[in-house]
């Protein structure tokens, strides 16, 4: 398990798993039981991304377009992540970092 990988995540009460991007530092991912993730939509993206979202798709290893929500971090146990789905491409990593900063008012 590594930063920028996309895994399936299904919290209690959610009807289906969602793609989730690991955004914790590599040291945390390697050594701690909890990681930060950004959750994506579970359905195919059929609209433009909102200012706090980034589109992920086949270039990131997914089978369809999805929207990653960059304005809300989820702290999850690593053992609740299953089914590795892909890796965020280098360009999308830059987009996600910029969107996290912008949507949280950090820049």
Can you describe what each PLM-predicted range is?
Residues 15-56:
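Compact nucleic-acid interaction/catalytic patches
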Residues 58-107:
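C-terminal terminal-subdomain/extension
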